[in-house]
Regions:
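An accessory alpha-helical subdomain
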Residues: 121-175, 293-339
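Glycine-rich phosphate-binding P-loop
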Residues: 30-49, 193-197, 202-229
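A cross-family "folded-core" feature that marks the main globular domain of proteins
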Residues: 33-34, 44, 60-63, 96, ...
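N-terminal pre-Walker A segment at the start of P-loop NTPase domains
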Residues: 1-22, 160-200, 347
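Conserved nucleotide-sensing/catalytic segment adjacent to the nucleotide-binding pocket
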Residues: 1-14, 23, 50-114, 121, ...
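Structural beta-strand/beta-sheet cores of well-ordered domains, especially the beta-sheet scaffolds
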Residues: 29, 43, 102, 206-207, ...
Length: 348
C-alpha cells in the first residue's frame, strides 16, 4: 500500500510546516537528510522507498509543495523508520540524537566552496527564487481576502452547528476506536503544477462521506466531527486546506476506514455517500443567495490562486537553475555507494 500527502504548504501567511509531527510516534526513528540544492536528497529517499515497495512493504510519501514530483519525506510503518529533508524552509533537527533521530549529510559529497563565478550565480539565483516566493505569497494573500464572503453571514452560526451535529451523528455510528491520536497533514498543495489534490489516502477508505459545501459550512462541521471522533477513541488524520493551512478540508479515520471530505469531485468512487449540508439550513431562499455569494468569492479567489501558481512555476525554474550550479560539484558515484549501503543496512 502506497499513500502520499504534503506536510508543507505555500499559503497566504507564507510557508507552513507540519513536519514536527512526522515520524514522531512511539518507537519511530527519523533520519534527517541534509544537503544543499541538487545534492540528491529526493533521489536518496526515493531509492529507499523503491526497495521497500519491491519487498511488499507499505510506504508513505511526503511530497514537496514546491515541486510535487520531488520527495520531502518517506515513512516505512513496518519499520517505524522515516527520512525527511531537513533543510529550509522545513528545517528539522533531532529530538534526542541517536535515540529517536539522527542526520544523513549528503552535503559531504559536494566539493565546496564553489568557484567565484558559481558563487555569484548561486547568490543571484537564491535571491531571485526567494523573491518569486514572496510575490506568490502576496497573491495567495489576495486570494484569502475573499474568505470573508465564505464565512456564515445570512445563515449564521446556528446552521454551522446543525451541520456539525449531522457529521457528529455519523461519527457516532462508526465503531469506536481504542487509542485516540490526532495527526495533521495537507491533502493537497498550491504548487508550481497548480492547485493539487492528493486523494490516495481517501482511496484506501471503504466509506467516504462527501460534504457538499455550496454554503461554506463544511469547515466548521469537520472541526466538530474531529472532536467527536477523538472523543470516541479514533486515530484521526486531519487534512488542512493547502491554501490557508488552517481550514479543515477532510477527516480520515483509519480504524473505521472512513473519511469525511469537503468539496472534492469523488463521484467516481464506489463507496461515496453525499451529505448535502446546505439542505440542513431550512430557508432555501437564503441558501440560494448564499450559494451565489460563495461561488462568486471562489471564482475571484481562483484567479489569484492561478496567478500565484504561475509565480511558483517561475520560482521552480529558478531553483532548477540553482541546482544545476551545484550538480558539477557532486560526487554522485560516492552518493550511490552510500545509498546502496544504507539500503542494505535498513533491510538486512
Amino acid at each position: 500500500m502506497e499513500t502520499s500527502y504534503f506536510l508543507g504548504a505555500n499559503t497566504a501567511s507564507g510557508f507552513l510546516s507540519l513536519y514536527d509531527g512526522f515520524c514522531r510516534g512511539e518507537g519511530d526513528y527519523l533520519h534527517i537528510v541534509k544537503g544543499g540544492p541538487g545534492t540528491g536528497k529526493s533521489g536518496f529517499m526515493r531509492a529507499i522507498s523503491r526497495e521497500a515497495v519491491r519487498r511488499g512493504m507499505d510506504v508513505e510519501y511526503v511530497r514537496c509543495s514546491g515541486d510535487p514530483a520531488s520527495l520531502d519525506g518517506v515513512y516505512l510503518p513496518a519499520l517505524h523508520m522515516g527520512w525527511c529533508d531537513g533543510t529550509a524552509p522545513h528545517v528539522a533537527e533531532p529530538g534526542i540524537f541517536g535515540v529517536d533521530s539522527d542526520y544523513v549529510n549528503l552535503g559531504t559529497f559536494c566539493r565546496t566552496p564553489l568557484s567565484s563565478a558559481d558563487t555569484d550565480r548561486a547568490r543571484a539565483l537564491t535571491a531571485a527564487y526567494k523573491e518569486k516566493y514572496a510575490q506568490a505569497y502576496a497573491l495567495l494573500a489576495a486570494a484569502k481576502s475573499t474568505e470573508s464572503a465564505l464565512a456564515p453571514q445570512e445563515l449564521g452560526e446556528k446552521e454551522v452547528l446543525r451541520a456539525g451535529a449531522a457529521l457528529c451523528a455519523l461519527v457516532e455510528r462508526l465503531p469506536a476506536g481504542e487509542s485516540p491520536r490526532l495527526r495533521r497533514r495537507f491533502a493537497g498543495a498550491v504548487s508550481c503544477e497548480g492547485v493539487l489534490e492528493d486523494r490516495s489516502s481517501y482511496e484506501l477508505c471503504k466509506l467516504v462521506y462527501l460534504c457538499e459545501d455550496g454554503c461554506a459550512l463544511a469547515a466548521g462541521a469537520l472541526s466538530a466531527a474531529c472532536e467527536a471522533a477523538l472523543a470516541r477513541g479514533h486515530r484521526v488524520i486531519l487534512c488542512l486546506s493547502p491554501a490557508d493551512g488552517v481550514t479543515p478540508d477532510a477527516l480520515i479515520l483509519p480504524d473505521a476506514s472512513a473519511a469525511f471530505v469537503r468539496a472534492m469531485p469523488l463521484s467516481s468512487y464506489e463507496h461515496v455517500r453525499r451529505i448535502p449540508l446546505d439542505r440542513l439550513c431550512g430557508d432555501m431562499a437564503a441558501v440560494k443567495e448564499r450559494r451565489r455569494a460563495v461561488r462568486a468569492a471562489r471564482r475571484e479567489g481562483a484567479r489569484y490562486l492561478s496567478a500565484g501558481c504561475e509565480t511558483l512555476r517561475e520560482a521552480k525554474a529558478l531553483h532548477d537553475e540553482l541546482e544545476a550550479v551545484y550538480r558539477p560539484y557532486m560526487d554522485f558515484a560516492a552518493l550511490d555507494a552510500l545509498t546502496a549501503k544504507e539500503i542494505t543496512r535498513i533491510f538486512s
